[in-house]
C-alpha cells in the first residue's frame, strides 16, 4: 500500500537504535498527518503508517546517515566524538549509551558503532568498520567559481553525488571578490565536503583544485586532464542536448551565472569540449550541477 504525503512533513528527533534493543526503548513519534491517516516514525528503523481503518504498514527508513570520522579519531577501534558531530548525536538524534550509529572513516571503510560513554561534551564509540563506500562517479567537474554562499551548497552537492575531482576556475563573469572568500580555505572546503559525504553515506573525500587564471589553465593543463574522457561544456544556446546515462568517463565544464562568454566557449571547444544544453529552461548553477550529474549518471 502506498500513500502520498499531502502536507508539509514535520520530522521529530529520533534515535538511531539497534534493532536488537528492547521494544521498551522504541518510542513512536508523530511525523505527519495526511489525507489518508497519520504517519509515525517508529525509532529510526521503521516508518509506520496507520490508516483511518486502523491498518498498519511499516517500512525501513534511516534517521542517521553517517558519522564520518578522521583516522586520528579512531584508536584501537575506539572513537571520541565532540563538537558538531556530538551535537548531532545528542541533540538531534537524542542518542544514549548503548545506541548504535553508522560510522565511516574518511577515505576508508564504513560500519557501525556502539556508544559506550557520554558526557555533556563528548561521546565514546566502539567502532566496527567492515563495508566499502559507494562507487565514485567517473566524472571530473570544471566549475567557474560561484558566489560564496552558493559555493557551500554546491560543494556539499558534488560530494553527496559522488564527484571526486573538482576544479574551481576563473571566468570573465566571476567577480574578483569571490576569490577572497574564507569559504575557499582548506578547512572550510573540507567541512562542506564532510557534510555532503555524511549525507550520502560515503567516505572518499573529493579533491578540490583552484585555478585563478582561465586561459593558462585551459591551454596548459585542461587538455591533459580531459584525455580519455568525453568532454562536455554546459551551454544553453547549444544545439546538442546533454547525453543521458553515459557509460564513459566525463569531464564536465559549468560556467558561472550568465554562463561562459563566447571567447571562453571557443577556447574550450578548441581543446575538445562539446557544448550541450539541458533544454529551454535556464537554471541557476546550484540547480544545473545536480541536474547535469543526474542526467549523465542516473542512479
Label the predicted regions.
Residues 225-265, 273-276:
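Active-site/ligand-binding-proximal alpha/beta "capping" segment
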Residues 45, 49, 53-131:
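N-terminal positively charged helical leader segments and presequences
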Residues 262-299:
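Structured adenosyl-cofactor binding patch, chiefly the S-adenosyl-L-methionine
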Residues 3, 16-18, 29, 46:
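Short glycine-rich, low-complexity segments
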Residues 1-8, 35-55:
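N-terminal, intrinsically disordered charge-dense segments
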Residues 133-230:
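RNA substrate-binding interface of SAM-dependent RNA methyltransferases
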